[in-house]
Amino acid sequence: NKKIDRTRIAKNPVGMVCKELQADVHLVYVEESYVKKFTDIINKVGLDVDRIYLNPYTSAKGTLDGEAWKLGVIYVDIGYASTSVTIVKKEKVLYARVIPLGETHYITDLMSRFNISESDSAEIIKKLKNKEFEADATIRCGTKKILLKDVKDIISARTEDIVQYIKDTIEISSFNEIFQKGIVLSGGTIEIEGVYEQIANSFNYKVRRIEPIPLKGLSNPSYSDAVV
């Protein structure tokens, strides 16, 4: 928002005369040295970097349709190692926030709770995504079986952390009244049994899941950035 002399809201104040101009600004920044490491790697393989994009932006761009970009949506990408919340409206990114919380944390939770290896834990997550359960409501892990209920309790606890993060981000952003298209979920983690449903039931907004924009050879929502 832009205000002229503390009272008048102006979409485009260029050319107006006033004593004071106010604006709400959200800055997204990254350490220059951090970016340089990536550009150096790209340069070493003989490629040039033409432009650098904010990762949540590219993920949203590769997933959302034009209507969502115009009318306003909260785009949540729950990936393998991080979760990003991107608030867009009128084809602009109004707010973006990322935390290191994703599928890998579900894996480590299962490792800790059931004292199993990382590969066994990852296999359980895969079975949850594919709904590969035993007839007696267990999940086979190597030579032993684990109660499906116990696994889902672990998944639910970690999902609640993500739900709270989304709520906190919406509150901090102050953009909680402009989303005609509600919340859109993407990323490989929402394929885990129960994750999407728990998030959808935690908000008054309309919540839906979405696949990346159709592209031949791309079916996994984990790679939505690649279509941009």
Protein language model features and the residues they cover:
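Residue-level signature of catalytic and energy-coupling elements of molecular machines
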Residues: I42, D77, L110, I166, ...
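Glycine-rich phosphate-binding/hydrolytic loop that grips phosphoryl groups
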Residues: R208-V228
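Glycine-rich phosphate-binding loops at beta-strand->alpha-helix junctions
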Residues: I178-S202
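Phosphate/pyrophosphate-binding loops at sites that engage ATP/ADP/AMP, CoA/4′-phosphopantetheine
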Residues: V163, K167-G182
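Short, ordered loop/turn segments at secondary-structure junctions
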Residues: L54-T58, K90, I99, E211-K216
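A conserved active-site cap/scaffold subdomain adjacent to cofactor or substrate pockets
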Residues: P100-F114
